[in-house]
Amino acid sequence: MKKNTDSEMDQRLGYKFLVPDPKAGVFYRPLHFQYVSYSNFILHRLHEILTVKRPLLSFKNNTERIMIEISNVKVTPPDYSPIIASIKGKSYDALATFTVNIFKEVMTKEGISITKISSYEGKDSHLIKIPLLIGYGNKNPLDTAKYLVPNVIGGVFINKQSVEKVGINLVEKITTWPKFRVVKPNSFTFSFSSVSPPNVLPTRYRHYKISLDISQLEASNISSTKTFITVNIVLLSQYLSRVSLEFIRRSLSYDMPPEVVYLVNAIIDSAKRLTESITDFNIDTYINDLVEAEHIKQKSQLTINEFKYEMLHNFLPHMNYTPDQLKGFYMISLLRKFLYCIYHTSRYPDRDSMVCHRILTYGKYFETLAHDELENYIGNIRNDIMNNHKNRGTYAVNIHVLTTPGLNHAFSSLLSGKFKKSDGSYRTHPHYSWMQNISIPRSVGFYPDQVKISKMFSVRKYHPSQYLYFCSSDVPERGPQVGLVSQLSVLSSITNILTSEYLDLEKKICEYIRSYYKDDISYFETGFPITIENALVASLNPNMICDFVTDFRRRKRMGFFGNLEVGITLVRDHMNEIRINIGAGRLVRPFLVVDNGELMMDVCPELESRLDDMTFSDIQKEFPHVIEMVDIEQFTFSNVCESVQKFRMMSKDERKQYDLCDFPAEFRDGYVASSLVGINHNSGPRAILGCAQAKQAISCLSSDIRNKIDNGIHLMYPERPIVISKALETSKIAANCFGQHVTIALMSYKGINQEDGIIIKKQFIQRGGLDIVTAKKHQVEIPLENFNNKERDRSNAYSKLESNGLVRLNAFLESGDAMARNISSRTLEDDFARDNQISFDVSEKYTDMYKSRVERVQVELTDKVKVRVLTMKERRPILGDKFTTRTSQKGTVAYIADETELPYDENGITPDVIINSTSIFSRKTISMLIEVILTAAYSTKPYNNKGENRPVCFPSSNETSIDAYMQFAKQCYEYSNPKLSEEELSDKIFCEKILYDPETDKPYESKVFFGPIYYLRLRHLTQDKATVRCRGKKTKLIRQANEGRKRGGGIKFGEMERDCLIAHGAANTITEVLKDSEEDYQDVYICENCGDIAAQIKSINTCLRCSKLNLSPLLTKIDTTHVSKVFLTQMNARGVKVKLDFERRPPSFYKPLDKVDLKPSFLV
């Protein structure tokens, strides 16, 4: 549309990030972080977790130990491809095997003697089956030689029965910043977690809480359940750091507001009073006494010295190999944050802030489960050894315990939505469309219990920390997930790092920090603490912090540390800390670098000329200071300019205040929002609704839908959209299509297309317009004897079955047809019966409203016969089906009109779809009109000057004015037809045409907006929604219809449906629908004295309550539903008396007649 000028350099750089980067191993950018995460797990982390050598049991002062060693971990890929797995209905799993050795070590004078107890060399093909993540082009990390299918982006797991599963990324519960909480007025807590580094296995977790009550400052304690003593936080800091209380006072008071300094003095004075209250106070003796008291309280089997070492050595596991003095200074820095947060809570990251959280990707899920299940496996072996020693006196292990690691069940539960046993479930989805396949693996959500904690019934807002890193449009608009599940923006990704890379990076950073003068990094009293993954390593001179951070960022961008995704955050605002983050699970995205008030993109004149031939990794290598990868914590505490345009309008002094500059607005949207057009030109709610509808659009899948027995709806004749964004193109959503182009007219049509109603042309449907095919899986399990039984009486339900008892291929199934033979037989205990065998049909019937063709049948013979049938049905648009544009103009088919009924233009062209014109004004979707204008302009000039097809770029969010798009359309029409008059040119630009009435052949008085647009068909189909039926299955207890369409049932008729049918006649309709439809009803007798239901004894109805009191009951017959009788009977059985009372009226037959005066009127 416009030439690539210098002002668009930021947009071109952003596009470079989205496209594939083979030099960096990036072949599909949207899901690259998921592929890397899973690849790290299965190629590296799984070996680290399963390779174990540790003691199980120890005896005789640790001179005898039972050891376990797991080695020779091998992971083997499957022999077949993902498509073969789908066809066979198998899961696509890798096989992991290992060797377990259990032996006894005895320490003797000669040395250590080893006695073998048990050994198992795992070669079982079902030992550990790990679901394989299918990546771009059907690749997997174990076998990259599988044949490539370029349009298969993957990102899925194939579960059994060929169901492709994807899941969202959960936010970790553990926060990287302590959680501040106000317990009650003047009472506060500061909770934080400490997790051991990734190289320490098994992972150790500790959770601590610092409590502070203004009325009891002496009780300002730190505690941890069963893992640490409860001790005064100031005294613990003094004990660990070996400094005086005055040192701690100065450290806490430095650069603090007066109110915080006052509280610091009060806390230090309270600690002094505590020490003065103890005679001959000694800090070591004080801590030792607390440890001894805790040892007695816990009744620990360890000696006091072992107990103390275990408690203090494991204090703060994330600083496992750090001296106690640094641990003490770390506690002082935490206390400093705590005291500041009491007075300035709003300046501290709250618990919902993404600054505090890491994110679990696919690889991390499997890693966590593998770690937990391995500990359970080792625990089971230990318990089995102890039981055998106790019962038999021998150290032995049952082979069953060795061969059941338990990982298979955990991984299977993961794909069904169950992450951990204690954490509830998280969201997983079957893979249906391209949009879901990309959006769901990039969704980030909180744990289910975090949803409950976060006040799920209150309105949740878009958290400020999610700005730029999350899509502000693609969020749930209603329900408990509002604000709790978000979509990553197109530039955002999640970091991954190997354990070896982590250790090397940590070592390089520490060496860089220690390269500074020793005194400058030892300012522990008034300096800025430097932490690496929350582990304190130094304290920097306050006069050097700016130079340090600037130099660190420059070295990082130049590749000095070997990792471009390191995050360095300078926390000012009196909290005074430099935080360096290198771990996995951090949100990162690129930003344009501002250095000393200059946009580094502008000071590289060679960049523009070379940009077209470079990849993103090339830019990072050859122009390292132009772009920086920034994590969400660094972004939050940095000054970031909103756009390049605003930055260039500032003065030089204002520019120096900024550290980074953002890319254009289109890069802040997610991939679903990028499939929309011009959401910034519409009203706000249209973007949220548009994202929800785009994910419901029916697309064309690339996988083999005819052989794969799975549910799905697929577009038969998809078209690539003409108006697209760069993200839509690079993600291959555009190439794989999710709609068709149709010609629309914005006008009213005989009052039929009111509100959301649309008119659709009959001939358009007959030509395959927006035609779909529905693939549906039917599965039944039949006992083997029932399947082998022969039917005695010919049944119409078996008319589509072959002699083998299975439905025929290409048979058209109707409602009531059986898909496999299932005949139950029973023997009557009657000696006089000639044939005491009776049989009846119990087969599962086809229940859909529409006919379907049988495409494929699979049978598995075990103890039961498992039959799976795939049916296909072409489904053209019918009344009630839903459609939408990419601007959230959803419509429902109100009328299917013949071509002769529709208005036409001067060329005889009739619209495919007629949409109510008032919807544009009510919903304020101006970008829908722009899309029609741009699509029509493309049809005039579809090729550029080089003869190449060029789609029109209309990003979801953009700063381009509407006039620029109108100018583009004008140039297209002037190029193709330069002789147009001004009026004709204006009509073509704005897609205004004169239409003719089909009945009178006269033109309409006003022009009609008439042009092409990309139209989507939604998954909401009329025949799938039909749940009100007059016959079907019923429950055994209450004999009402089953609830749920999938179970062959219906819906219960409620008050809203009742209100809709009042016009039909309230009394008759309610009686028919609520009572007379098919629900069993019966006559019952009610006692008018006590209101009980009469009992029937020897065919005589009597009231038990009244008969015991020798009363003469009056029984009245009423007509009620069976479920009402069941309800009253069950309530009576639970001791609740429900009395049925009657309305008392005088009998109308015996009412006295009105007196009639028969006198002549003239005598009155």
Swiss-Prot record:
Disulfide bonds: none annotated. InterPro entries: DNA-dir_RNA_pol_su2, DNA-dir_RNAP_su2_dom, DNA-dir_RNAP_su2_hyb_sf, RNA_pol_132_poxvirus, RNA_pol_bsu_CS, RNA_pol_Rpb2_3, RNA_pol_Rpb2_5, RNA_pol_Rpb2_7. One of its GO terms (biological process) is DNA-templated transcription. It catalyses: RNA(n) + a ribonucleoside 5'-triphosphate = RNA(n+1) + diphosphate. It is an enzyme of class 2 (transferase). It is found in: Virion. Its main location: virion. GO terms for cellular component: DNA-directed RNA polymerase complex; virion component. Pfam families: RNA_pol_Rpb2_3, RNA_pol_Rpb2_5, RNA_pol_Rpb2_6, RNA_pol_Rpb2_7, rpo132. Keywords: DNA-directed RNA polymerase, Metal-binding, Nucleotidyltransferase, Phosphoprotein, Transcription, Transferase, Virion. GO terms for molecular function: DNA binding; DNA-directed RNA polymerase activity; metal ion binding; ribonucleoside binding. Its EC number is 2.7.7.6. The DNA-dependent RNA polymerase used for intermediate and late genes expression consists of eight subunits 147 kDa, 133 kDa, 35 kDa, 30 kDa, 22 kDa, 19 kDa, 18 kDa and 7 kDa totalling more than 500 kDa in mass. The same holoenzyme, with the addition of the transcription-specificity factor RAP94, is used for early gene expression. Belongs to the RNA polymerase beta chain family. Part of the DNA-dependent RNA polymerase which catalyzes the transcription of viral DNA into RNA using the four ribonucleoside triphosphates as substrates. Responsible for the transcription of early, intermediate and late genes. DNA-dependent RNA polymerase associates with the early transcription factor (ETF), itself composed of OPG118 and OPG133, thereby allowing the early genes transcription. Late transcription, and probably also intermediate transcription, require newly synthesized RNA polymerase. This is DNA-directed RNA polymerase.
